[in-house]
Amino acid sequence: MVPAWLWLLCFSVPQALVEVSPTTLHVEVPENYGGNFPLYLTKLPWPHKEAGGRVVLSGDSGVAAEGPFSVEAESGFLLVTRALDREEQAEYQIQVTLEAEDGHVLWGPQSVTVHVKDENDQVPQFSQALYSARLSQGTRPGVPFLFLEASDGDEPGTANSDLRFHILSQTPAQPSPDVFRLEPRLGALALSPEGSAGFDHALEGPYQLLVQVKDMGDQASGHQATATVEISIVESTWTPLEPVHLAENLKVPYPHHLAQVHWSGGDVHYRLESQPPGPFDVDTEGKLYVTGELDREAQEQYVLQVQAQNSRGEDYAEPLELHVVVTDENDHAPVCPPRGPPVSVPELSPPGTAVTTLSAEDADAPGSPNSHVVYRLLSPEPQEGPEGGAFQLDPTSGSVSLGAAPLEAGQNMLLQVLAVDLAGAEAGLSSTCEVAVTVTDVNDHAPEFTSSQVGPVSLPEDTEPGTLVATLTATDADLEPAFRLMDFTIEAGDGEGTFGLDWEPDSGHVQLYLLKNLSYEAAPSHTVVVVVRNVVETVGPGPGPGATATVTVLVEKVMPPPRLEQKSYEADIPVNAPAGSFLLTIQPAEPWNGALRFSLVNDSEGWFCIQKVSGEVHTARPLQGARPGDSYTVLVEAQDADAPRLSTSAALVIHFLRAPPAPALPLAPMPSRHLCTPRQDHGVLIPAPSEDPDMATGHGPYSFALGPNPTVQRDWRLQPLNDSHAFLTLALHWVEPREHIVPVVVSQDARVWQLPVRVVVCRCNTEGECMRKVGRMKGMPTKLSAVGILVGTLAAIGFFLILIFTHLALARKKDLDAPADNVPLKAAA
């Protein structure tokens, strides 16, 4: 018994026994204290001066007004008034407050935690006084088959509750006194190696064990308790399993029972492992199940390992193996190989030539009917008849070869082959395989010319070498570009090498060129034979008649071209010369057998023109933009009208002169003439002003032109007749009938005159005489009087007609009223 003053001394030293925290005081009290009470626990941090008031204790349910704790108001000591039991309550939470009479808090609250220190006052207890267990023969040594359970009411984790298990006795003691082994800390009962060796020969037992549990750990002192364990030894039922054959895609309710295992010992848990993992399970009774459909193509066989384990997952014995073999069902159709690039078959290949071999894969069991694949050609369908189809198919090997029907180059065909398992039975699964076939070309066609006869082609004998004579075209029915390459040669008709060939091998066109000068006297004609051949050797028959083309060339004798009087010409003209002014005449140097046609070239300004037949050069329009002192060059070309290739040319240089002064004496208007409208074949003859000796001093011909007025040039046409006269006619079909003043410009050398020509345009009769409108004659009736006379005449005629018809009517009536006897004889007849 510890004296009270000692406890007071201990609790008065906070540094030793009291754990002080900023907010909570911790105090430890031994349970079942046997000393005097009250027991001083600790001194609270009470106010230094008497504050008065009352002390209030509050806390958990173990602290009440009549509870085991109190506070001495004078000293501030916390007291416990009776013994505490840790098993009843291990800890108390207290709050101490000093309050005034009115409830006002003077001090606190102060939290205090009281820990009840454990004493070894509890005896261990087994969960059962008698344990029963079954031990199967074949149990591995060291694997617990029974777990003893005991409890101690003292504080966990302390020596007071640290339990140890021991076997006190074993009955019977055969074959060894240590048949079993008990794990001291866990209470796990297992077979010892000595006991396991004994059980291999014969069954023993039952066994009875007296076991003990003691607290205080490995210390000699402590409380203890005992229990009895009865162990029966049973024969092992852990026997190997026969393989199970299970059909794939089995349509049964799942889970589906496969087999059952049984561990004859007690406290067993079954565990299942599948290699590879599969849809399998085991229940608490050891029944094995498949939980879903199996697929043989995914996994042909499973190895199931079943383990019998204790509650800690330790195997009692070696696992049992169950082999599950998945049997095949015809659940997979043949799989065709992927469609590859087209298979090339040469044209003209003989029947039986191998094309390709199909190999459809069936995922069902190899060697079984489910994977026995046969083949059938779907497209193109086999044809009846002596030739048969274009392809043949071996139904067993899937080999495709050529049939007797011919194939054409360039054909692209798609073969469809049906692959059927179950050796082609009706219930077999099938797939359609496709093979693309292309018939490649061979050089079995010789090239041929599109035309075997060309010409005749006429060439002048002065034709320059290098001139193209003719172009020949050849075709080749082959498709391959390499087989269409052609080579051309001159086979006959060109012994002197007068002609040559030029071509591109892949063009199909060949040009026949002239290589040497022709001679009409040496050979007036040539017959050139050209042959075409393939560059690549032809398969089959050689070139036919179409491979030869004949070109006929006729040589024309060359005539010399015409010559002009001069190699170049020069002429002068004032810059104000009107349109139609004469410059000069171009003449050939010698008479030409044919007709010459003249033309101007390089007249960029369009100032001049030349008569095609006569060669006279005139101004085509006013020389606007020309400056005195400048020169203008055009090219005069003369060609034979029948042979345009016979031509010559000469340069015409025109010098522009300053405009001469206008004549001082104006011309008198010419007397008026008349023309008919609508236009008839009549005109007005305009002479040159030769009457005036001052104006007719020139020596050259006269030129006539219309004035620059656009309306005049539109309505009238002026044609020169000779060097001194011109002919004026209407240019339009209809011109307004009236008197017109037509300005005509006349020029001679550098002198210019303007003649105002009076022309009366009128309507004409058939003889071409002008019908002129006349004025009203004296005494001629007016329109009104003429109408009156006409109306009066018609009225008089009408009046006389009325009298006549009235008289006739009255006479007829008188005749009808007379008696019959008075009718004249002539009338009666």
From Swiss-Prot:
Ranges facing Extracellular side: 19-786
Matches recorded under Gene3D superfamilies: Cadherins
TM region(s), chain numbering: 787-807
Residues with glycosylation annotation: 517, 602, 722
Chief localization: membrane
Topology within the bilayer: Single-pass type I membrane protein
Domain called Cadherin: residue spans: 25-126, 131-235, 242-336, 341-449, 455-564, 569-665
GO cellular component, one term: catenin complex
Highest taxon of the lineage: Eukaryota
Subcellular location as annotated: Cell membrane
Signal peptide: 1-18
Tissue-level expression: Kidney specific. Limited to the basolateral membranes of renal tubular epithelial cells.
Side of membrane Cytoplasmic, spans: 808-829
Chain segments carrying region Ectodomain G: 666-786
GO molecular function, one term: beta-catenin binding
Keyword Transferase: no
Biological processes annotated in GO: adherens junction organization; calcium-dependent cell-cell adhesion via plasma membrane cell adhesion molecules; cell migration; cell morphogenesis; cell-cell adhesion mediated by cadherin; cell-cell junction assembly; homophilic cell adhesion via plasma membrane adhesion molecules
Entry-linked Pfam families: Cadherin (PF00028)
Alphabetically ordered keywords of this record: Calcium, Cell adhesion, Cell membrane, Glycoprotein, Membrane, Metal-binding, Repeat, Signal, Transmembrane, Transmembrane helix
PANTHER family: CADHERIN-16 ISOFORM X3, CADHERIN-23
Domain notes per entry: Three calcium ions are usually bound at the interface of each cadherin domain and rigidify the connections, imparting a strong curvature to the full-length ectodomain.
Function (record text): Cadherins are calcium-dependent cell adhesion proteins. They preferentially interact with themselves in a homophilic manner in connecting cells; cadherins may thus contribute to the sorting of heterogeneous cell types.
Name listed for the protein in its UniProt record: Cadherin-16
Species in which this protein is naturally found: Oryctolagus cuniculus (Rabbit)
Gene: CDH16
